[in-house]
């Protein structure tokens, strides 16, 4: 793919194109050019070499070449990175949750909290589907499928950006501070410290004397991994080397075990959280004061211990020195420096400014879409976050826009030029992309349903052409037509389904479908197709091959009045052969004559009936019978029909032979009547 100087659109180069690169002028000189046909809604089509219009006086077209008989399939790349099963899983969740909508009540803090948690639960459900796919992709890569790596990397960024948005705008838990969600995001984004490093340090003769012991412990504190911090302190060997520190270490372990940020289930209210956190911070400050008074401890050990306490106390300068990037510093500030001032996106934006300001040593790389999304989310700029999410992945953008809009964080931008909201625009584009590149029409339509007018029109235009591979697909399409009151489109769906059934030789079901669709012209066409099949095979339809068709042709009560009327020619010829097979010639003759005398019987098929009549009259059993199997009335009816159609019958020899046999029948009847 490349950009074009002439139009502001991407240009795709087809592989194995009909005309080789550099040969276009040669073909043009022969009066040819390349042409293509696009699928009604898929991003694919066929290319071929075609005659173009030219002036015959100045240019002559060369003779046809074999390459012109070939067609070449092409498709444009999909802009979606998600595998189909993830798109389907999202679609199922989307349909379940779209009807559950909560309107923000801005004057009620309790309602806003409930709203945030509600959409946080929904967000985590969608995001959990990505995690399942990531685990599966990683498993496949471990088994040697290295081509999965690009998809894994892209989806990992999508999941991480989604987790960032969830932590700030709709956390499913942590109602008293957003700091824990932000910390979880960073720990998932960049898992630190590495567990194997910790095992190596703890296996050292005296662990705290390992050169990486204190950096490792500090990292566990910065990441809020207090259980690991406690484990390191207990196994450090500090209290053995310095017994005077035992009481201090035990006190620090007790403080870490009861951190209010990591034990929010015990907290009853916001004020209770604030009280517990201030008490926790005061215990740390007091412990630091006690440690500084120690005089009989190695100064280096004492300094390292104080650094750990400074980190836990939220000392910005000390925390920054132990951080590797702005995300880590930002989350540490939220968790250790200001969890009380970390309750909403506005608070988060202030912490972000602190983490990336002039006094910070960290650089924000705005050229990476994933990082720019997180920057916008942390800066309380949801609209800009959606713009960059769109560039990273359309699936991420549409779901974030939906959640941010419904939770009240994203305004509805509507203008005369764009009369739909940003959310609706993204939903329409996402549905279009899913349909064009993956042909997942059920998924596409599930999203389009949520956009009243535009989505309705798109479904109406596309649903008659969707592939109906099984009964479930057909029922889904019909149910959607019923929901949206698309009566004409439902009839087209049934007609399409009938075509699928006919391709599988399920004619009985196809007739029922066409009858339900009220497509009587198609029903009539299929009827005569069955009529021709029956005559060509010279036998009735078998119930073993199509039980429903056999039932429809054998019992008019199984049909609606309209269906029974339209299929009567095919049903009659079926019954004719059935009676012949069961040696009921008189019954068969009644049906055959009925077809011959049928009003508006297609003249193109009349010769076939004459051949059947000729075969019937010249059947050895019929010729040698003492009881003629054609009633006198039917004989006269046949003669009358032959006289009417004489001018249209080309095979006059056949006509003469039938006349002779019918005349013999009349003689036979008069002879037996006189007796």
UniProtKB/Swiss-Prot annotation:
Keywords: Cytoplasm, Cytoskeleton, mRNA transport, Nuclear pore complex, Nucleus, Protein transport, Translocation, Transport. InterPro entries: Nucleoporin_Nup85. GO terms for molecular function: euchromatin binding; structural constituent of nuclear pore. GO terms for biological process: mRNA export from nucleus; positive regulation of DNA-templated transcription; protein import into nucleus; ribosomal subunit export from nucleus. Its main location: cytoplasm. Pfam families: Nucleopor_Nup85. GO terms for cellular component: cytosol; euchromatin; heterochromatin; nuclear envelope; nuclear periphery; nuclear pore; nuclear pore outer ring; nucleolar peripheral inclusion body. It is found in: Cytoplasm; Nucleus envelope; Cytoplasm, Cytoskeleton, Microtubule organizing center, Spindle pole body; Nucleus, Nuclear pore complex. Belongs to the nucleoporin Nup85 family. Component of the nuclear pore complex (NPC). NPC constitutes the exclusive means of nucleocytoplasmic transport. NPCs allow the passive diffusion of ions and small molecules and the active, nuclear transport receptor-mediated bidirectional transport of macromolecules such as proteins, RNAs, ribonucleoparticles (RNPs), and ribosomal subunits across the nuclear envelope. Due to its 8-fold rotational symmetry, all subunits are present with 8 copies or multiples thereof. Functions as a component of the nuclear pore complex (NPC). NPC components, collectively referred to as nucleoporins (NUPs), can play the role of both NPC structural components and of docking or interaction partners for transiently associated nuclear transport factors. Active directional transport is assured by both, a Phe-Gly (FG) repeat affinity gradient for these transport factors across the NPC and a transport cofactor concentration gradient across the nuclear envelope. This is Nucleoporin nup85. The gene is nup85.
